[in-house]
Amino acid sequence: MTVQEFDVVVVGSGAAGMVAALVAAHRGLSTVVVEKAPHYGGSTARSGGGVWIPNNEVLKRRGVRDTPEAARTYLHGIVGEIVEPERIDAYLDRGPEMLSFVLKHTPLKMCWVPGYSDYYPEAPGGRPGGRSIEPKPFNARKLGADMAGLEPAYGKVPLNVVVMQQDYVRLNQLKRHPRGVLRSMKVGARTMWAKATGKNLVGMGRALIGPLRIGLQRAGVPVELNTAFTDLFVENGVVSGVYVRDSHEAESAEPQLIRARRGVILACGGFEHNEQMRIKYQRAPITTEWTVGASANTGDGILAAEKLGAALDLMDDAWWGPTVPLVGKPWFALSERNSPGSIIVNMSGKRFMNESMPYVEACHHMYGGEHGQGPGPGENIPAWLVFDQRYRDRYIFAGLQPGQRIPSRWLDSGVIVQADTLAELAGKAGLPADELTATVQRFNAFARSGVDEDYHRGESAYDRYYGDPSNKPNPNLGEVGHPPYYGAKMVPGDLGTKGGIRTDVNGRALRDDGSIIDGLYAAGNVSAPVMGHTYPGPGGTIGPAMTFGYLAALHIADQAGKR
């Protein structure tokens, strides 16, 4: 058995793992990152790259008015008592410090996403103007040979243009508002300038991971790809290393030991691609085919920690979002649910929620019950997004430009249905025609008045962010009445699972009795979320992942200094 030795071993190369490794290296600890996949970046690289950390230096430079007290009121209020208040406070108090460290030691550049509100902006302490920041486009050529190892983007943008989160909402208004035209010109100019100057610009999550990788290059931290974590190594009751194997080898291949003199930080994602774990912990219907999380996320870290007695929390939940299960690649729906001229109905042909609500809560409503939990299968799965031709002519849908034809393969699969009448559409989708027609008629009356009397769609600043400001009187309500009609099947997809290892304020793994598993730390989706069952705003996954990776590495360094 081959043996290597470092002070710190980090498992996983997403934002949590990279920040942890960066901190450890800058504190003088020899560090290695091991990654099962052939690319680094994990689900972070596939994401929008948003980071939700109130009162950080990027927001302050932009003059965003906020206070620690307001952020504390907001987060404690929406999370509730399911998460220890000390963990919430640690995140809020240390998150800005973490971000300043990262900005200092990497070429990462961040900017505010103006108007992208907190997901519950009307709650006490919530901000309609938003607290989310995102990475500016990054020239991946700066990575040198490591450019080839960057996790590919989840979705391909037409003409390979580089789009930021704040671009997308304006591009969706291209056919409806002058701001859409201006933003389209700006995005096009950015892309042409990059090509003319020989740059390979990347955006969103890849623009976050790329600079972090350069930070590790400068700090001398190797990132070992195709290196699958198989188990934890324990010596004298302390986690003192990891077993790994080449990802190309059979699972029965003899593992190699990498010793960790000071600690192991698990940052290897959730279990969204582990069918058995999903069936065990999560409510039916559930599958690995609806997630957009990185394919390497199969719960390896959670299972290894559980064998050592680690407590697991919130395993029944995920970073859900209503998703169109397109053949080969599910589509996580955002603006599609907010744009006027659409509704979501269950198999009874009835609405059951505010279609534009935050995506985690929307899937909780799809499942039914408190936080989506209850006996038996989910109550509103599948659901159907119903819209008309005017909606298609005006807005982006599942990556298709306004007016672009629905691909025949989508129609052939039955995931998308099309018909000249609502009754015919109902037949194709398996819905009761009379009920669907009545539901649409009632909704159309709300659209004309501008008031959703049933579910209050369009009343929240979050709803309106992805709405159409030129649509009056409500930017989220539009009549469905211009044939042909379309139906898109909706299922509870996710960005990744939520549940994982219970940790303390320093990211240390805990047992059920509250005792510490010495030498073992966890951050990101391998750990139970500080956000509980909720989601505070754009970047509410990546912000805590980075912060607790930072705190874990600092604790290891501090303990090493005491020895």
Curated annotation (Swiss-Prot):
InterPro entries: FAD-dep_OxRdtase_2_FAD-bd (IPR003953), FAD-oxidoreductase_2 (IPR050315), FAD/NAD-bd_sf (IPR036188), Succ_DH/fumarate_Rdtase_cat_sf (IPR027477)
SUPFAM superfamilies cross-referenced by the UniProt entry: FAD/NAD(P)-binding domain, Succinate dehydrogenase/fumarate reductase flavoprotein, catalytic domain
Cofactor(s) listed in the protein's UniProt record: FAD
CC per GO annotation: cytoplasm; plasma membrane
Keywords: FAD, Flavoprotein, Lipid degradation, Lipid metabolism, Oxidoreductase, Steroid metabolism, Virulence
Reactions catalysed: a 3-oxosteroid + A = a 3-oxo-Delta(1)-steroid + AH2; a 3-oxo-Delta(4)-steroid + A = a 3-oxo-Delta(1,4)-steroid + AH2; 3-oxochol-4-en-22-oyl-CoA + NAD(+) = 3-oxochola-1,4-dien-22-oyl-CoA + NADH + H(+)
Phenotype on disruption: Deletion mutant is unable to use cholesterol as a source of carbon and energy, and has a limited ability to multiply in resting human macrophages following infection, reflecting a failure of the mutant to inhibit the TLR2-dependent bactericidal activity of resting macrophages.
Keyword Oxidoreductase recorded: yes
EC number: 1.3.99.4
UniProt binding sites for FAD: 7-36
Short name of one Pfam family: FAD_binding_2
NCBIfam families hit by this protein: PRK07843.1
The protein's name: 3-oxosteroid 1-dehydrogenase
Higher taxonomy: Bacteria, Bacillati, Actinomycetota, Actinomycetes, Mycobacteriales
